Amino acid sequence: MKQYLDLEKYVLENGTQKGDRTGTGTISTFGYQMRFDLQEGFPIMTTKRVPFKLVVSELLWFLHGDTNIRYLLQHNNNIWNEWAFERFVKSADYKGEDMTDFGLRAERDPAFKEVYQAEMEKFKTRILEDETFANKYGELGNIYGKQWREWKTSQGETIDQLADLIEMIKTNPNSRRLIVSAWNPEDIPNMALPPCHSLFQFYVADGKLSCQLYQRSADIFLGVPFNIASYALLTHLIAREVGLDVGEFIHTMGDAHLYNNHIEQVKEQLSRTPHALPKLVLSDKPATIFDFEVADISLDGYNPDPAIKAPISV
């Protein structure tokens, strides 16, 4: 997708070198927007393979209001493992090798990488096989799914923002309050990772549903391709439920950054030529957005270039 490649080029050429929480360092810019016409195809990277089924299972995990990585692991989805693992290795229950700064150390020390990978495999196995352990150490706090589906009020009640949003689109499509927020200041200290994609808004015009995402922190190489595909998929699912066509996905970013250890991968991606976008295929079986399963969602005509691996910063 040209819009995404333009973002990578812009940050490489105009970004500012900054330190960051992870210790990796970034090239960063503040304030950037991309627009995708969802009528022109499903916006997923074609200059590198994005594992679409992982996008699907993560979004369904959000839609279920789930915040435990066990569901993800049951669907062979490892994208949230490091944050749960970090909580575990910092606890008194962890008795293995020192895992301080495991992400950076695994990248730089092959011997430690083997130890880390072995500990991670043991952790994943325990999450899958031991429900008590999973309940304690698979939890990531009140992240996206919890805020979307069960926002706690000061009166002790809960708000299902997503269900309310869908109902409002049906009954008052011209509303300017078609918003879901994952940014709950009270819960931030207890989240494994505060919401990067923190707020989204829908807009109805000419029989089409459009979505704008505000993302406070955008990991351009690893995170943003998932975010684009995830919110495009969410727009399609909601449009199906409310009887509208899809319009645009508008992606607005605050701190948009390239990690310093992703620069060579970015240059490799920029050397590739985009291909035709695939088509999203949804099963007719699910009655509502909350009834979808991974097998109900697929892409037709997705023929990307090979994946480009890069380390994740935790």
UniProtKB/Swiss-Prot annotation:
Top-rank EC class of the record's enzyme: transferase
Keyword presence, Methyltransferase: yes
Catalytic residues (positions): 196 (nucleophile)
Catalysed reaction, written as an equation: dUMP + (6R)-5,10-methylene-5,6,7,8-tetrahydrofolate = 7,8-dihydrofolate + dTMP
HAMAP family: Thymidy_synth_bact
Binding-site residues for (6R)-5,10-methylene-5,6,7,8-tetrahydrofolate, renumbered to this chain: 219, 313
Protein name, as recorded: Thymidylate synthase
Subunit comment: Homodimer.
Role of this protein: Catalyzes the reductive methylation of 2'-deoxyuridine-5'-monophosphate (dUMP) to 2'-deoxythymidine-5'-monophosphate (dTMP) while utilizing 5,10-methylenetetrahydrofolate (mTHF) as the methyl donor and reductant in the reaction, yielding dihydrofolate (DHF) as a by-product. This enzymatic reaction provides an intracellular de novo source of dTMP, an essential precursor for DNA biosynthesis.
NCBIfam families assigned: PRK01827.1-2 (NF002496), thym_sym (TIGR03284)
Pathway: Pyrimidine metabolism; dTTP biosynthesis
Gene Ontology CC annotations of this record: cytosol
Family annotation (CDD domains): TS_Pyrimidine_HMase
Keywords: Cytoplasm, Methyltransferase, Nucleotide biosynthesis, Transferase
PROSITE patterns per UniProt: THYMIDYLATE_SYNTHASE (PS00091)
Family: Belongs to the thymidylate synthase family. Bacterial-type ThyA subfamily.
GO BP, sorted A to Z: dTMP biosynthetic process; dTTP biosynthetic process; methylation
GO molecular function: thymidylate synthase activity
Residue positions binding dUMP: 21, 176-177, 216-219, 227, 257-259
Pfam families associated with the record: Thymidylat_synt (PF00303)
